[in-house]
A protein has these predicted regions:
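Canonical Rossmann dinucleotide-binding motif of NAD(H)/NADP(H)-dependent dehydrogenases/reductases
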Residues: 16-56
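Substrate-binding pocket helix/loop in short-chain dehydrogenase/reductase
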Residues: 117-118, 122-127
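SDR active-site lid
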Residues: 191-258
C-alpha cells in the first residue's frame, strides 16, 4: 500500500508523466534567485561542482564562491531585485547574451523573514515581504516560463517553508507570504496540466524547518533536536539538487516529519492547540531571536531606504523587549 501510494504521488506530482526528463547540464541554463547566500549559495556551488552546470545568479548581494571544478563554466551574476519585473527582464537578456539561450530551470530561493506583531507591523512591511517571498515567483514565471512551456521541458522550483502550513506568533508576514508561495506552486502545477498542456515541465516545492542561515537566526532553536533539528544549508541544497537532476518534480520536506504538516490543518482545533503547547511553538520567535538575527548580519545588504520602516519597527520591538527584560530583573 505504501509503495502504491508512492507511485501514485509521483505520477500526480509529474502531471501523469512519470518518466524522468533529466536536465542536459551542458545545455540547460539554471537561474537561481537568492543564490549569493544561504541555501541558494549551496545549491549554486553543488550544481557547479557536481555537474559543471551553466548557472546565472540573480541577487542584490554579490556572491563569493569557492572555485568550481576545472572546466566548469563561470557563474554569471546579475544584480537583480526580483520584485522588479524590468530588472528581471534585463537579467534575462544578459543571460541569453551570455549563454546563448533562455533558462529552462528556475530555482526561486530569494526570501526574507520580516517579523513582528500584527498590530504594530506596518502594511508596508507585509507588502514588501509578500513582494519578495510570493510575488517574485509570478514575475519569474512571466519572464522564464514561456520558454519552458514552448519546449515542454524544464523545472520551476519554489522555496517555501514549513511555516506555509503552521503559523507562528510574530512571524505573520513570513508565514502568510510563504503560504502564498505554496499556493503559487500548486496553481502553477495545475495550470501546466490543464491550461498549457506542458506535462514535462516539472514543479517542486521545498518546505524546510529552521535552517542555519542568517535568516534562520530569527527562529529560536528547538528544544527537541531529534524531531526538529536545525538543518544545515547543504542538507536542503543537496535534496534540491538531487531533485533537479532526477528530472522529476516533488515536494521536498525536511526534516522527514514535516511531510505530515499538511495534515495538521485537518486536525481538530483542540489537537492543534495541544501540538502548539507540546511543541512550545508560541515562543519560537521572540524579539530577542529577531534581534539576534540582525546582530548576526541579517539585512546588512538591504536597501536601507526601501526597508527603513522595517528597521524602525524591529528596533522598537527590541527596545520594548530590553525594557521588559530589565523590569523583570528588578
Amino acid at each position: 500500500l505504501k509503495e502504491l501510494s508512492k507511485v501514485c504521488s509521483r505520477s500526480a506530482s509529474n502531471l501523469g508523466v512519470s518518466k524522468p526528463d533529466r536536465p542536459k547540464w551542458k545545455k540547460d541554463v539554471v537561474v537561481i534567485t537568492g543564490g549569493s547566500t544561504g541555501i541558494g549559495r549551496d545549491v549554486v556551488q553543488h550544481l557547479s561542482r557536481k555537474f559543471g552546470a551553466r548557472i546565472a545568479v540573480l541577487d542584490i548581494t554579490e556572491p563569493t564562491y569557492a572555485p568550481a571544478k576545472y572546466g566548469a563554466p563561470d557563474i554569471l551574476y546579475v544584480r537583480t531585485d526580483v520584485t522588479n519585473k524590468d530588472e528581471v527582464a534585463v537579467a534575462h537578456s544578459k543571460i541569453k547574451d551570455h549563454f546563448g539561450n533562455s533558462p529552462s530551470i528556475v530555482v526561486s530561493c530569494a526570501g526574507v523573514a520580516l517579523a513582528g506583531p500584527i498590530l504594530t507591523t506596518s502594511s508596508r512591511t507585509f507588502s514588501r515581504t509578500f513582494d519578495i517571498n510570493a510575488l517574485a515567483n509570478v514575475i519569474l514565471a512571466h519572464e522564464f516560463l514561456p520558454y519552458m512551456v514552448e519546449n515542454n521541458h524544464g523545472h520551476f522550483m519554489v522555496v517555501a517553508s514549513s511555516a506555509s502550513y503552521f503559523s507562528l506568533p510574530l512571524l505573520g508576514p513570513y508565514s502568510m507570504s510563504k503560504s502564498a508561495a505554496l499556493a503559487f506552486y500548486e496553481t502553477l502545477r495545475a495550470e501546466l496540466r490543464s491550461v498549457y498542456k506542458a506535462h514535462r515541465v516539472r514543479t517542486s516545492v521545498v518546505t524546510p524547518t529552521k535552517v542555519r542561515t542568517l535568516l534562520g537566526h530569527a527562529l529560536k532553536d528547538s528544544d527537541n533536536n531529534f524531531l526538529t533539528p536545525v538543518l544545515e544549508p547543504i542538507q536542503v541544497a543537496s535534496a534540491m539538487v538531487d531533485t533537479l537532476d532526477s528530472g522529476l518534480g516533488r515536494a521536498i520536506s525536511q526534516p522527514m516529519f514535516t511531510s505530515l504538516l499538511p495534515y495538521v490543518r485537518a486536525l481538530p482545533e483542540w489537537f492543534r492547540g495541544l501540538l502548539t503547547t507540546v511543541g512550545n511553538t508560541d515562543s519560537s520567535v521572540t524579539a530577542e531571536s529577531i534581534a539576534n538575527s540582525f546582530k548576526a548580519g541579517y539585512g546588512k545588504n538591504w536597501n536601507k531606504d526601501d526597508f527603513a520602516n522595517v528597521f524602525g519597527e524591529m528596533e522598537s520591538m527590541v527596545r520594548a523587549f530590553a525594557k521588559k527584560k530589565k523590569k523583570n530583573r528588578n
